[in-house]
Amino acid sequence: MLLDLSKIFGKSKNSKDLAKERLKLVLIHDRANVSPQFLEMVKGEIIKVISNYMDVDEESLDIQMTRTKSEDGNSVVPALVANIPIRSVKNSGK
């Protein structure tokens, strides 16, 4: 069962958007050998931490597990790629 973060964090998506998001998660799972549930948990944790410091557009947030060449170029390793639109930075007072 996929975690539906839109219910937890507010704004609801229409059926088309949900189906598209689920398909993306399945494809990511196939490429990186991680479950869609794991990726949703990572996404939720990233949102939680970043939200302490800035207001982000959760609807446009895109996090993917991909594969890339290692630094030595001899192997392929998983990589976490995040595109996180920032609406504003919170005043931390520090």
From Swiss-Prot:
GO BP annotation list: cell division; regulation of division septum assembly
Protein task: Prevents the cell division inhibition by proteins MinC and MinD at internal division sites while permitting inhibition at polar sites. This ensures cell division at the proper site by restricting the formation of a division septum at the midpoint of the long axis of the cell.
Organism of origin: Acetivibrio thermocellus (strain ATCC 27405 / DSM 1237 / JCM 9322 / NBRC 103400 / NCIMB 10682 / NRRL B-4536 / VPI 7372)
HAMAP family, alphabetized: MinE
Keywords: Cell cycle, Cell division
Record-linked InterPro entries: MinE, MinE_sf
The organism's place on the tree of life at top rank: Bacteria
Protein name: Cell division topological specificity factor
Family that this chain belongs to: Belongs to the MinE family.
